[in-house]
């Protein structure tokens, strides 16, 4: 009675008498699930990322405004915002410990997270949608990509450093280095953020096996 299956299972969960909803399904579904939970008056843990495309993000922002009006608790899955040491670190930076911040370079270099299985693993009765949802990480509509689904933590820290003000511009390049005809996500992306004060944030994201691994943040100030 407490287990629900299917693409509409979220409705049954919300209507089952719960007080809090934890949204951790593939992020392509997050805007729809968030909207339904807010409209039902539920408190929510909203895992990152909140969406995989611009329409989804706009929907999430609208739902967030409604949640505020209803007085609902919404906690986002950007874990570093709740890390005491990291919070103290960013506070000291904001207080001028290294002078005026000029640049942040963030790296998110790892191996593949959920490699796409071979086509032979697909059962005959599975539709294209079921196959893609089962392998959601490898399809942009359902999982975003390595930048959206994983390195968004680094994007969040860059935003945090610069006062959560949106950048003036963001220029990116990327592609697929490995020969792989399954799925459609890129395996490497580089982004250059320019902020209003002239400071820049750089983000390097890559998920290729057998390469150097690193998840670091380098911040440079005037001191």
Regions found by a protein language model. Give the residues of each.
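Active-site beta-strand termini and strand-to-loop segments that position acidic
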Residues: 192-197, 221-222
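A structured beta-alpha segment of the ubiquitous adenosine-cofactor-binding alpha/beta core
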Residues: 2-23
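Loop/turn elements at helix/coil->beta-strand transitions in domains of secreted/extracellular proteins
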Residues: 17-21, 39-43, 69-73, 99-101, ...
């Amino acid at each position: 009675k407490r287990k629900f299956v299917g693409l509409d299972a979220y409705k049954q969960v919300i209507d089952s008498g719960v007080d809090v909803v934890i949204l951790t399904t593939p992020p392509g579904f997050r805007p729809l699930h968030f909207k339904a939970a807010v409209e039902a008056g539920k408190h929510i843990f909203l895992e990152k990322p909140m969406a995989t495309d611009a329409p989804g993000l706009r929907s999430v922002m609208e739902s967030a405004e409604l949640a505020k009006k209803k007085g609902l608790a919404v906690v986002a899955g950007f874990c570093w915002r709740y890390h005491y040491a990291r919070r103290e670190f960013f506070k000291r930076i904001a207080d001028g410990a290294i002078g005026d911040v000029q640049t942040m370079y963030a790296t998110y270099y790892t191996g593949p997270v959920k490699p796409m299985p071979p086509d032979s693993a697909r059962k005959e009765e599975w539709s294209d949608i079921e196959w893609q949802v089962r392998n959601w990480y490898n399809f942009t509509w359902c999982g975003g990509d390595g930048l959206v689904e994983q390195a968004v933590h680094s994007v969040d820290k860059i935003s945090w450093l610069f006062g959560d003000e949106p950048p003036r511009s963001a220029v990116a390049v990327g592609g697929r280095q490995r020969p792989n005809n399954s799925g459609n996500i890129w395996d490497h992306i580089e982004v250059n953020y320019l902020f209003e004060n002239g400071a820049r944030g750089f983000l390097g994201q890559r998920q290729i096996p057998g390469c150097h691994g690193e998840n670091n943040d380098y911040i440079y100030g005037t001191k």
